[in-house]
Swiss-Prot record:
The keyword NAD applies. Gene3D superfamilies: Lactate dehydrogenase/glycoside hydrolase, family 4, C-terminal (3.90.110.10), NAD(P)-binding Rossmann-like Domain (3.40.50.720). The gene is mdh. It comes from the Bacteria. It catalyses: (S)-malate + NAD(+) = oxaloacetate + NADH + H(+). Substrate binds at R93, R99, N132, R163. InterPro entries: L-lactate/malate_DH, Lactate/malate_DH_C, Lactate/malate_DH_N, Lactate_DH/Glyco_Ohase_4_C, Malate_DH_AS, Malate_DH_type2, NAD(P)-bd_dom_sf. It comes from Mycobacterium marinum (strain ATCC BAA-535 / M). Disulfide bonds: none annotated. It holds the Pfam family Ldh_1_C. This is Malate dehydrogenase. HAMAP family: Malate_dehydrog_2.
Length: 329
């Protein structure tokens, strides 16, 4: 275990997702049993005491791979030299808040964090945004970090991707490992489009295996898209452990690469592929290698899928317009 520690910065580290995420990172879930991790944890001042308690628990686990922990409320200190930044902390939507209020509140957070990353992060920085509205928060951070290559920013749609795999596996009676090439298009919101028309179940086309368009339209798509709300309804709190798990999955795929026979979903900067306007951060099917992603090209998009992709893309364009008018990008 001679490799130098990967410096992983996590924002909102004392929150619910952070509480699940930090122990996964420290135990080696990200890069395996041979790469030590240094955690750099950012929180707002009032949450630092709670974060100290979490660090006590991390200490008490005596994780062999955890080489150090630094906590604080100053992004420039916490992001200094970071190789991976997981931006989990975000302002939740409160009672009476309009979406524009939410965009504005988070805009201030992600503007400041983008600027700090731009100044002090390591040259090989990768930035994953989990805090919602994730796509547009990633766009704001990216825009405020002009010296970091734009392809180094991604927003999390891996949770939706994992949810879609789970639903399809249950429907077809196979293991989740038998599902390949699932795709989430668009925004991490209720307009997202979980697309199984290119997915495979044990090597066969998923839509043909399911052979039930009504199930796809009336159950599969809305169940995946509205799963977060269903969990809040059942649990009385938002999905935290599954979001943390997906955050680890996404970062691991990004850093270590995708298998030759599969792809993953990541919200990344559009190059105009599949009719998604350039400059939006939208979810696509991507392959990864050596820490870089590539949008899967050449997939046929039928009329049904086209309408769904256009709808979620329009929402992303509206969000970009709103934050542009707020002067955030």
């Amino acid at each position: 275990m001679s490799a130098s520690p990967l410096k992983v910065a996590v924002t909102g580290a004392a929150g619910q997702i952070g509480y699940s995420l930090l122990f996964r990172l420290a135990s080696g879930s990200l890069l395996g049993p041979d790469r030590p991790i240094e955690l750099r944890l950012l929180e707002i001042e009032p949450a630092l005491k709670a974060l100290e308690g979490v660090v006590m628990e991390l200490d008490d686990c005596a994780f062999p791979l955890l080489s150090g922990v630094e906590i604080g409320s100053d992004a420039n200190k916490i992001f200094d030299g970071a190789n991976l930044a997981l931006l989990v902390g975000a302002r939740p939507r409160g009672p009476g808040m309009e979406r524009s209020d939410l965009l504005e509140a988070n805009g201030a957070i992600f503007t400041a964090q983008g600027k700090a990353l731009n100044e002090v992060a390591a040259d090989d920085i990768r930035v994953g945004v989990t805090g919602n509205p994730a796509n547009t928060n990633a766009l704001i951070a990216m825009t405020n970090a002009p010296d970091i290559p734009r392809e180094r920013f991604s927003a999390l749609t891996r949770l939706d991707h994992n949810r879609a795999i789970s639903q399809l596996a249950a429907k077809t009676g196979v293991a989740v490992t038998d599902i390949k090439k699932m795709t989430i298009w668009g925004n991490h919101s209720a307009t997202q489009y979980p697309d199984l028309f290119h997915a495979e179940v044990k090597g066969k086309n998923a839509a043909e295996v399911v052979n039930d368009q009504a199930w796809i339209e009336e159950y599969f798509i809305p169940t995946v898209a509205k799963r977060g709300a269903a969990i809040i309804d059942a649990r009385g709190a938002s999905s935290a452990a599954s979001a943390a798990s997906a955050t680890v999955d996404a970062a691991r795929s990004w850093l270590l690469g995708t298998p030759a026979d599969d792809w993953v979903s990541m919200a990344v900067l559009s190059d105009g592929s599949y009719g998604v306007p350039e400059g939006l951060i939208s979810s696509f099917p991507v392959t990864t290698k050596d820490g870089n992603w590539s949008i899967v090209k050449g997939l046929e998009i039928d009329e049904f899928s086209r309408g769904r992709i256009d709808k979620t893309t329009a929402e992303l364009a509206d969000e970009r317009k709103a934050v542009t008018e707020l002067g955030l990008i």
